[in-house]
Amino acid sequence: MLAAAIGVRAHTVSLALYRSASRVQRSTARRAVTTRAASNTVATSEKKMTTKKLPKARPLGSAKGPDGKALMVTEVCLGTMTFGVQNTEEDAHAQLDYAVKERGVNFVDTAEMYPVPSSCPGWKPGTTEEYIGTWIEKNPTLRSEIILATKIAGFNPGSETGGNRFVPPKPSADCRLDRESVLMACDASLRRLRTDYIDLYQLHWPDRYAPNFGQSVYDPTKERDAVPIKETVAALGELIAAGKIRHYGLSNETTFGVCEFVRAADELGVPRPVSIQNSFCLLHRTFETELAEACAPSHYDIGLLPWTPLAGGALSGKYLHGKKPAEGRLVKFPAFMQRYLSAPCVEATEAYEAIAKEAGVSLATLSLAWCRTRWYCTSTIIGATTMEQLKENIDAFDADLVTLSDETLKKIDDVHFARRDPCMIPTDAPPRALR
């Protein structure tokens, strides 16, 4: 009963912190709209880039820092999956320097299998973690200033990622979420990251079958034997007890999965997951229903970390109107995230582009700033291949620069309700934007 009471108090404190942060955001929004009433949106141009540091504005779910207080993170998290494919080590360090040192971003996300896509010639799992590790080695005093998150790969038999956990590496090994794999993968990530602890250790995708990565329905014929969730949670509890990780989170999970992980944690006396990293953007808003309820501060208090908030780059508008940018990820890697270039997605993206023009911002800025308005979004994971993209993306989370009006938000919802989650619509048609 004592543990339950403590849990209730923790949830109450976290909800109060969220509401307090929300009040500040609403107050900022009102001031911005009042001072610039002639515009739907307060915006900045690329010519007026800022170096203002962002505040640590949101609690990371139920997580507590070393001081026992809510663990606060910036509303934007630096994603790193292009480090090692489209970005060199020098590029990676420059992005980390800018985001962390100049803009105050205190949240960095990576994974043992990064970079992606793995179809890229020369791909090597773990490269991204290695780049981050060399940056940490160059900036040792900053290690305690950032929340470092990485991920263990889920079910993937005969994978080079699994083989990379061994010393020396093996050509391949199964990726599973059993106890031995969880402990081994964590140790391998610690070595590559050149640190002795990971702030947030996430399960990249489930060990069991679950519809993911564009799959829109659950197919019971695809069910398979899976590692018991209790075994995975117990292993994560061992890592917490050993001081190797401080918190753990889920990724690409369903409402059923979230509930099962919480139940297993409570039965084992292990802390609950504090975050969930799922696909979420203007073209994919399925999180808003059952998952949002389960993860709410008043329930399991699990913060959403949206990945691909720009739909693989499609919500930058770079693939609209017949454009095929040679350096665009969806052009360079034609098997990667093509669902965002389907005809239904292109139609919705064009509608959002029109709203962005009316608001006086880029489509990318609109898409990211919209994520910031969602009460369940703790920190939105951004990725960039150029410094210009990175600066624009971070600026979208500065409320003094970009605040979407109620009118703009209503227009966004109108498009959504007319073209709900278009990336989930099955289609055999070739991507319209790349024909």
Predicted segments — roles?
Residues 80-90, 167-183, 220-226:
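Active-site mouth loops of central-metabolism enzymes
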Residues 178-197:
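An active-site-proximal structural segment forming one wall of the substrate-binding cleft
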Residues 191-214:
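Active-site groove signature of glycoside hydrolases
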